[in-house]
């Protein structure tokens, strides 16, 4: 499928990311609709021009109109949605997601939809420390990295359609990784860094530390303010890979600690 101005796009889930997708695509002149159980989210998105129309409940007539469907949902909710409403999607449509884990999710989604609808995983590497559609921004993905995670079940045409979506959003760099490669990369670059930030914030009573904090602590802990429900689910979906990355970090942190304990200046300088 070629992604052009004639194509209709459905966003399922109007939070920060789904709302920002809607805002960015509407700003490019695309017809965007949405499904979200929160009537206030639908009303806000309509009022601010993020979407042309929306529903709080999916129905076959509505969801069957769209050529491209973007799921901005937690992994387990995405799979539940596809299991229940997937047959309503138009034959020949393309479906994609924004979830931060791919192994298991992509394969299960494809099994629920194929061959009528082709599902391809994608992950925009952008976000904010706040949630909800009220904080959505049309420029959220400008200059961001955008990862597409095709499998052998995907055609080249669909892969290129998903990459075109990334370009419409304003992504600077678009990459292709397998779901496994994605989860290994994301376990280190994103999930591990969030774990470190959370650990820093919880290892010491911090009520009065704000009076003495400098840039280094603020920079390291900025991402500690996270959606605990979403990130817990993402960590558990990627548990084995994240544990491997945590063990790697602990080993290198231990090496630095040992060098400090032994007064080993050369090792410390080398690591720095």
Describe the function of each predicted region.
Residues 1-63:
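NAD(P)+-binding Rossmann beta1-loop-alpha1 motif at the extreme N-terminus of oxidoreductases
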Residues 59-89, 93-96:
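Rossmann-like NAD(P)-binding element
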